């Protein structure tokens, strides 16, 4: 091999290694809460002033609220999908915000609500089942043929039976309908090409089958996908991820459930009978998004909140462990935890912790959990101060600490 060829090969190896590292170093940031739509002047404009701070947390992706016109102000009862004038701001405001995040090398993830949809008009029978897409042509202008025939609240539907769970607040859309598949796929691609979105968060993904989600993912080719399957059964989540394929991941509700109970004096639960983590990260860490709270479980809804005095123990866990961690807006800005969260995220980045990093659980007892991640980081959570001799090897130094948590990293990095 010639000198120049060897040099080129060496450079190629370096570039490929860097690309692989960047692809693995992912932190998702949820950029809204349940009350964000109430912000005076619009949430999108308000968020322009937060881009720099969000970037400083180490976030690589930001999850934004549902983009379309909606009957509910929060965006989860969408109607005219192409109409981007919502309670969060205008389409122009949204596009400008996405560009601002892109300027900081942060990819934007759209909250995609396609299980159900609200109609604009009644038909001749007086039933709300006539949809308008928000354009001057007939794209997404649907009727009873596009509603599931077994919808319990809108039984006037003439489509196929639902492929997933029902949703009472709005008509369930027939995802087996070729027109629905074609036009929703076109809309998703429009969100990518016209707005600049790079990925999808699939709302209420239990409402339609993984096979249907796969169609939209395959047709729109997002770089990032995470499904919301509000369930503690990790087998259900694993089956969905495998069924969708490609870049699909799922929010790790099993880990949230176990962790928020374990930090209250039952940390022995953080090691399963197989010696691995008990949540989805114990099975498919590269396909898992871990989180502490979101706009449903926390915020003002508080449907399933993490213990408020132990939130930072939760972040010490997810930000140093396998999986893709998700940081919640409220904790950074409303709870004033930005400094502590950023310190943990920095440890993650500096040590190259990625979704598939190795996890060696050293201790999992009532008031103590200790684990080594990627061979470079050791994390302790729990109230016990004395963790025992020889647990922390020589050559490790404290990198981040707070109330009942501490993180060490190898010296000399």
Curated annotation (Swiss-Prot):
The keyword Signal applies. InterPro entries: A-amylase_bs_C, A-amylase_pln, Alpha_amylase, Glyco_hydro_13_cat_dom, Glyco_hydro_b, Glycoside_hydrolase_SF. Substrate binds at residues 76-77, 201-206, 235, 276, 282-284, 295, 301, 380, 385-387, 408. This is Alpha-amylase AMY3. Belongs to the glycosyl hydrolase 13 family. It is an enzyme of class 3 (hydrolase). It catalyses: Endohydrolysis of (1->4)-alpha-D-glucosidic linkages in polysaccharides containing three or more (1->4)-alpha-linked D-glucose units. Ca(2+) 1 binds at residues 115, 162, 172, 207. Gene3D superfamilies: Glycosidases, Golgi alpha-mannosidase II. Monomer. Ca(2+) 3 binds at residues 151, 167, 170, 172. It holds the Pfam family Alpha-amyl_C2. Important for breakdown of endosperm starch during germination. Ca(2+) 2 binds at residues 132, 135, 137, 141. It comes from Triticum aestivum (Wheat). Binds starch not only at the active site, but also via accessory binding sites on the protein surface that are important for efficient binding to starch granules and thereby increase enzyme activity. GO terms for biological process: starch catabolic process; sucrose catabolic process. The keyword Metal-binding applies. The active site is at residues 203, 228. Residues 1-24 form the signal peptide.
């Amino acid at each position: 091999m010639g000198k120049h060829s060897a040099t080129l090969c060496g450079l190629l190896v370096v570039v490929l290694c860097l690309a692989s590292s960047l692809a693995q170093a992912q932190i998702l940031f949820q950029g809204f809460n349940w009350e964000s739509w109430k912000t005076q002047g619009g949430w999108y404009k308000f968020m322009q002033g937060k881009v720099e701070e969000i970037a400083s947390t180490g976030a690589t992706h930001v999850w934004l609220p549902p983009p379309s016109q909606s009957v509910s102000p929060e965006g989860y009862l969408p109607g005219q999908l192409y109409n981007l004038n919502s309670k969060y701001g205008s389409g122009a405001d949204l596009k400008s915000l996405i560009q601002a995040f892109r300027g900081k090398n942060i990819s934007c993830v759209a909250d995609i609500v396609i299980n159900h949809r609200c109609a604009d008009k009644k038909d001749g029978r007086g039933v709300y089942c006539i949809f308008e897409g928000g354009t001057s042509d007939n794209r997404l202008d649907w009727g009873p043929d596009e509603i599931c025939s077994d919808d319990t609240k809108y039984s006037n539907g003439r489509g196929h039976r639902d492929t997933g769970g029902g949703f009472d607040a709005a008509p369930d859309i027939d995802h087996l309908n070729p027109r629905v598949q074609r036009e929703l796929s076109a809309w998703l691609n429009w969100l990518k090409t016209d707005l600049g979105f790079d990925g999808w968060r699939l709302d209420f993904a239990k409402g339609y089958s993984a096979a249907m989600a796969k169609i939209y993912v395959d047709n729109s080719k997002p770089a990032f996908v995470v499904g919301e399957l509000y369930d503690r059964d990790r087998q259900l989540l694993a089956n969905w991820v495998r069924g969708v394929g490609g870049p699909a991941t799922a929010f790790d509700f099993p880990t949230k459930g176990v962790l928020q109970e374990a930090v209250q004096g039952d940390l022995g639960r953080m090691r399963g009978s197989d010696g691995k983590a008990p949540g989805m990260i114990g099975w498919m860490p590269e396909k898992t998004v871990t989180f502490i709270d979101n706009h449903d479980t926390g915020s003002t809804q508080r449907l399933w909140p993490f213990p408020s005095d132990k939130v930072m123990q939760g972040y010490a866990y997810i930000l140093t462990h396998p999986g893709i961690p998700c940081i919640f807006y409220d904790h950074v800005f409303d709870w004033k935890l930005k400094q502590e969260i950023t310190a943990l995220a920095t440890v993650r980045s500096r040590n190259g912790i990625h979704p598939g990093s190795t996890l060696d659980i050293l201790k999992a007892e009532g008031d103590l959990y200790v684990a080594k991640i990627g061979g470079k980081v050791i994390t302790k959570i729990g109230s016990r101060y004395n963790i025992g001799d020889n647990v922390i090897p020589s050559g490790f130094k404290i990198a981040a600490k707070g109330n009942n948590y501490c993180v060490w990293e190898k010296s000399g990095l």
